[in-house]
Amino acid sequence: MKRSRILCLVLVLCLLLAGCGNAAKNSENAEQENQTVQSQMETDDTAGENESAADAQEAVKDNTEDGQVIHTAGADVSLSDLSYQTSDNNAPVVFFTSDISSEGLIAIYQALDWKPTGKVAVKVSTGESERSNYLRGDLIADLVQSLDGTIVECMTAYGGNRAEIAKAKQAAEDHGFTAFADFDLLDEEGEIEIPFDGGARINRAIVGSHIDDYDYYLILSHFKGHSMAGLGGGIKNVAIGMSSRSGKVYVHSAGTRTTGNIMHNNQDAWLEALPETVKAVSDYLGEGRMVYISVMNRLSVDCDCDGNPAEPDMHDIGILASFDPVALDQACVDFVYAAPDGGSLIQRMESRNGIHAIEHGEEIGLGSRSYRLEIIDE
């Protein structure tokens, strides 16, 4: 009996010890499971935090890109305010610098990586009077000389100081152009007609006969307003600036005549004749033979053909350059709209429907209104 009790006690003790062992093991397993779950939760939390951080960084990146501030020569503007600017790599590039100086002009020319060979003509407006806002020699001389370029121009069709050979040459001298470069009136010895069948308004461009004396053309323009076209940039500098006197009348009349005054009775029609003339000239010269730079300073509502222009009431912006004249003019327009003080020039452009020349330029394949802005400033 005593032995039986002892055996029972031993059995109970063994059972108790086994239970404690299983409990300890279960407790250990539970602890391991808890640690695994906790670790997984921490991992998930970390992943979520990292994902949220990445999303936040991407959002900041997107906001930075959309709201990138462009430092112009005057007031800053937002990249997102340039209506036709795009990130599409297939869009034509428009280069920009806020440095309106001889050095800035050379820098933006170099950004184009244009490699002209042979004779280079530089098409500028030589200005109607000393009060006109034409590009001054201290700004453009170094670039023109680096190209061994010849300043070219045509006579005007509205009278004034450049309506005759002697007067036009005298104006170029008086305004300082002959001090740093040769000067050539493209229509001094007459004109030639360039056939064109890709437009709605004209069937030819009538330009100065010296056009064939040059292998490449740098279209160096002063962007501003215009009393008839609303705005003047690269398109107008070619369409009117390279046309002979009768060619100018032909453009202004939207292809209806070559004599008489330059007044017109169909605003949109004559605006369409502008890019059509540029397309005719560009096709005639060949791809890559023309490049465009526009300087956005002294932004008057009036053209450089005006001898007594209105004083600018907005800040300077910068210098822009492109192989595409439509993209370049559109970018200049976008900068005016983005500027906080562009109201007067905007009113001038809109009152003449000046944007229509750019619209039609895209329609006929002269270029693209959409562009990719590349800022060359450091």
Name what the model sees in each region.
Residues 17-19:
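C-terminal motif of bacterial Sec signal peptides marking the signal peptidase cleavage site
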Residues 24-84:
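N-terminal, intrinsically disordered, polar/charged segments of Gram-positive cell-envelope systems
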Residues 74-141, 146-378:
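Extended, low-polarity segments enriched in aliphatic/aromatic residues
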